[in-house]
Amino acid sequence: MKSVITTTISAADAAGRFPSSSDLESVQGNIQRAAARLEAAEKLASNHEAVVKEAGDACFAKYSYLKNPGEAGDSQEKVNKCYRDVDHYMRLVNYCLVVGGTGPVDEWGIAGAREVYRTLNLPTSAYVASFAFARDRLCVPRDMSAQAGVEYAGNLDYLINALC
């Protein structure tokens, strides 16, 4: 799984060298942010049901046409699948926070997702709206510390940009 540490080691190994000073500074920065990432991961895990519900609700409020006949959310079963997808991506964001890299989203979330959504007539913009809502509803210090919020929002930004 890709993280700052594994990427640094892989690059050094591929070049047949030891990690450079700048490589080690990058790893050190990643380690220094670990406590904030783990705080964000813990808060997300303990509140994930509410986060997923609010994010999904925001999606369907913004894109109410999705519940029209023939659209992606025209039955309760399809609506439930959308919430399931939001939950899946939020778990991947949690995993990214834990490992300190984007590997979980890259490897398990993005590869082929846009093509699948197009084939199933599921607009990625609706998912993007869900994740933007989850990012924007964050309130520091109510939900987590400022640094944990930066880590959380940064991972959601990465996911949003990957889905666009």
Swiss-Prot record:
CDD domains: PE_alpha (cd14769). One of its GO terms (biological process) is photosynthesis. Keywords: Antenna complex, Bile pigment, Chloroplast, Chromophore, Electron transport, Membrane, Photosynthesis, Phycobilisome, Plastid, Thylakoid, Transport. (2R,3E)-phycoerythrobilin 2 binds at residue 139. One of its GO terms (cellular component) is phycobilisome. (2R,3E)-phycoerythrobilin 1 binds at residue 82. Pfam families: Phycobilisome (PF00502). It is a peripheral membrane protein. It is found in: Plastid, Chloroplast thylakoid membrane. Contains two covalently linked bilin chromophores. Its main location: plastid. InterPro entries: Globin-like_sf, Phycobilisome_asu/bsu, Phycobilisome_asu/bsu_sf. PANTHER family: C-PHYCOCYANIN ALPHA SUBUNIT (PTHR34011:SF4), PHYCOBILISOME 32.1 KDA LINKER POLYPEPTIDE, PHYCOCYANIN-ASSOCIATED, ROD 2-RELATED (PTHR34011). Light-harvesting photosynthetic bile pigment-protein from the phycobiliprotein complex. Belongs to the phycobiliprotein family. Heterodimer of an alpha and a beta chain. This is R-phycoerythrin alpha chain. The gene is cpeA.
